[in-house]
Every structure is written in C-alpha cells, then in structure tokens.
From Swiss-Prot:
SUPFAM superfamilies: S-adenosyl-L-methionine-dependent methyltransferases (SSF53335). It catalyses: a 2'-deoxycytidine in DNA + S-adenosyl-L-methionine = an N(4)-methyl-2'-deoxycytidine in DNA + S-adenosyl-L-homocysteine + H(+). The keyword DNA-binding applies. One of its GO terms (molecular function) is site-specific DNA-methyltransferase (cytosine-N4-specific) activity. Coiled coil: none annotated. GO terms for biological process: DNA restriction-modification system; methylation. This is Type II methyltransferase M.AvaI. It comes from Nostoc sp. (strain PCC 7120 / SAG 25.82 / UTEX 2576). The gene is avaIM. Keywords: DNA-binding, Methyltransferase, Restriction system, S-adenosyl-L-methionine, Transferase. It comes from the Bacteria. Gene3D superfamilies: Vaccinia Virus protein VP39 (3.40.50.150). Belongs to the N(4)/N(6)-methyltransferase family. N(4) subfamily. Its EC number is 2.1.1.113.
Amino acid sequence: MTSFELESPIEIKTDPTDLDQESDSFVQEISRFNKALEQRFRDKMRLHESLSRKIVSFQANKSKPQYRWFKYKEAFSVDLVNQLIFEYEKKSFERILDPFAGAGTMLFACSDAGIQADGIEVLPIGQEIIEVRKIIQRQFRREDFLRLIEWYKQKPWNQHNNRKYLNRLRITDGAYPPETEASIERFLFSIEKENILVKQVLRFALLCILESISYTRKDGQYLRWDKRAFRKSGSDKFDKGKILDFDEAITEQIKLILNDSFDLISNTLFCYGTQRSGINLFNASCLKILPEFEQDFYDCIITSPPYCNRYDYTRTYALELALLGVGERDIVQLRQDMLSCTVENKEKSLIHNWQEALRILDKQELLQSILRFLERELERKKLNNNGIPRMIKGYFYEMACVIIECFRVLKNGSPLFMVNDNVRYAGIDISVDLILSNIAEEIGFNVEKILVLPTGKGNSSQQMGTHGRKTLRKCVYVWRKP
C-alpha cells in the first residue's frame, strides 16, 4: 500500500467569518458562496495522512545533500516530488514543468529521476541557486574541487587587506558587524582571482551564510533586526542569538558543499537506475514565458506559487539580492514582475492576452464577494494596509492567467499538482483552494482531488491579534487536463 492509498474523505467545515460579523450582509454573502463551493468539491477533498507540513515545506530538505546548501524556506521537499511522481501517478514522464521554480527542488528531483525538467523563476536568488547546482553537477572539474579544498584549508581572504565593495540596499545597510563586513569584502576581492566557475561557487557559499553572520533574520514579510544592529529600525527586544563568526561559517559551508559534491561524484551517473536528465531554466516571470511555450508539450506540472500572504521576497532575501548586485530600481521592478502577493504590487495589464481568464474571474462569485467586502472595509478604514484589496484581486486574476497557460501547455490526460495555503484578511477566511480549483474547472481541468494536510497553519500574527488564532487549510491540488 502506498502513502496515496492512505486517504480519507474530509468533511469541510469552513467558517469564513468571526462570530461578531455574522449579521453583516457582506459576510453572509461570502459565507453563502463559500458553502456552495464546499458542496461542489466535497467529494474531491481528501485528508492525506502522509502529507505533513514537513514534506510540503523546506523542512524535509534540511538533511538532503545539495538541497540543504541554501535554506530556501518557501520550497517544498524532494520527498513530495518523489511521492507525486512515483506513488501518485505511477507512470513515466518525459518532461515536467515548474512555472514557479524557486530553488529548483522539482527540477533536480526530476532530473535525478531521468526526467527532463523545465522551470521558470523570476527572482535572482532562485536563479543563482539553480545555476550553481547545475555547475557543480555538470561543469566542475577535478581541479575546480581542488581549489575549493585549498580555500577551505588556507582561507586566502585572511592573507591580505584588499577589499571589494559589498553592494548594499537601503534595507541592508548596517546588516553586518563591522569586522564581518570587512571579511566579506576581503573574500569578494579574493574570489576575483579564480576561474569563473570556482568564483561563482565561492560566491554562492557566501550567499548561503549571509543571514547567519548578520544582525537579521527572515521573518515572513520582512527582515527582523537584532537589537545589536546599529540602526534605528532594530528592535529593542529581539535577540536572534549567536551571530556566527565569518571564518567559521564560510569554511563550514565550503566543507558542506565539498562533502555533498563528493557524494554526488560517487553517484553521478545513475539515480533511480537511470541517467540524470537535463534542466532548462527560464529567468523571467512565468506570465511572460508561459505564452511562448508550445501547446500540448508537458507530461506534468508540479509547482507551488507564492501564497497570497503578503510575503515580500525582495525584503526577506534582501541580503542575498544585494550580494548578487541587485539595485534599488531592480528591486522595484522585481516586485512588479512577481506574482501579486505583496501590497506593493501594482495592477498588471492582462486584458490583451487573457480575456478568457478575466471573464472567468469576473464571474467567480466567492472571489467577487470577498473583493466587495474588502473594498467596504477599506472605506471604513478597517484594513491594516490599503493595498490589500488590490493585492488579492491581482493575485487571483494573475493566477487565472497562469492556470490557463498551464492548461494550454499540458498534454491531454496530464496532471497539474499545486501546493498552496488558504489565507485570512480582515477576519475573513479566503478559501484559495476552492476558488483556484473552481477557476481551473472553468478553464477546462478536471479537479481530481484536493489533498488536505492533517494539520493546517495559523493565520498571521496581525490577524491573531485582532481576530484570534484560526487554523487554515494547507493543500495539494490535483487537477488533470482531459
């Protein structure tokens, strides 16, 4: 018996409202439309015991060689990909797509299984992680590994006082202790003497440790600052604990890359009994790239889009983006290019390419009732940010465009697996799983299953403070093109 036979029906009991809102006509309308979708998908919802939060997040990758190099917390695990490919589908694929590739978990898992993997990623940090892993797997030579060993042993950045300027953003200024910043700049100067491949891998090693040697910690929507930081925005109370010494952190990271790479070399030709396949990465927004793809081309799509949770990756990964040379104007453009999941996103022009998707969204009753409620709350000054209604509208309208393109590029009979979370704003639960599944159905997909995790997630700390803690569904959607 496989883990995907350990499913059980689940009774949906979504109460999208607070008790003190029940008499509100806007809220009553939301509740009515929500219950209608619950009834529509009642037979598709399945509680899945093996889908823990660990397996649908980065946590399960922390012990996996290569996957553990960079802690990309928004990723799902390689174990999830293997479950979906080998246990759920139980058939061979030639080519799989991830339109939100992130750190490339799906790409490398499929490549190791002998499946051609294509990905699209807009953020430079994800692009860099994928590129460096490809370099180490496919281009690094024996002498390149020997150079890494020399760096590990000799610490050449400590043998001179020359420095290369560390790029900064307003949000990253003052992020490191002065002695750490000096070490970083000596390190950057030293790597300039290496060949382009060794240089890129060494810079990646530095990229992997930036948070651990800084005054900052990634905290959902922003960077949280330690009280020891020399800036006014640092918290008077927050103490992130030990800030690692630069030499200790960078040598341990180089050692980790070497150890995992030696394991890679010893197993380089065969994994799952087949030769590793190619990886293609397209560096841009999937809204730009997907329309360029051939119709009926992919055997499967496995993806996890950004959640509609206000997380701004240009802030949480600001240290890494600065090291990669991203400037202030680039940050503004990146925020606009990304899927609308932050309050700073401006409305995108979608009307020329996706009129059918927009028509479907305009008729989606639950979403439209939620948008009317949020606009009313905005007028009443009840929202903690005025950009929330625009963000939520943009998120679903853009996701509809992505879904319609995914439908177009999939072969007949092929599945789309999507990991996503429900969210809550202004005391209202937004059933992302039901809304997106309804959109997918209108586009032409068969909604095969909505696999629900046994334990959901809490709403944001802001929501808890005003409306109390409430568990929200976390799911893996399974849609299939007929």
